[in-house]
Amino acid sequence: KTMPRFWTDNGFYIEMLWLLSIGIMLDYEDDLIHGLVQLIKDREAKDYIYDTLIRYRFPDWERTTNQVLYPSPYRIAITVTELAEQDKAEAVKRLEKYLKKEWYRGHSDLSWHDDHKYGINHDGYWCFESGALVKVLGLDDSSLKGLPYYPYDMVHWNDNICLLYTS
């Protein structure tokens, strides 16, 4: 409820990215995702990753741009998406490199970077957008399981539930 009062595409970009990503991974109800989408639309936030995630849930959503608002570190989403169209295995390899070498370093300017070193409350570092991209692009993420920052369990939270209903 407070997000509409404070959110701007520049001010809280990563928070919106995380909310959309978590919503995709956990199969949030469309009305919850729609609230985020409406905020993006109202603020005219043009971002490739937002568009990619939104189109997964709302296929009629028009892509607004082929750019990301923050190229460093997020331009990787464009690369992974383009690779997935040609070779899904290569897309996973590129995502793996991003998780291992680029994601954490690419966020060194954010306030939560290095929180674990200061003895304050810390709930981990998670690259939620990587899990959402895996789901949206239909990638096999078995090689990403156990990698730092990759939310494998969140991507697969309902695998066993689905098996129960299909058995």
Q: Locations of the language-model features?
A:
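Eukaryote-skewed repeat-based solenoidal scaffolds used as protein-protein interaction platforms
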Residues: 1-111
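Detector for Asparagine
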Residues: 10, 66, 121, 158-160
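Short alpha-helical "patches" and their helix-cap loops
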Residues: 32-42, 142-160
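C-terminal structured interaction module
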Residues: 98-154
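Conserved small/polar residues in nucleotide/adenosyl-binding loops
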Residues: 165-166
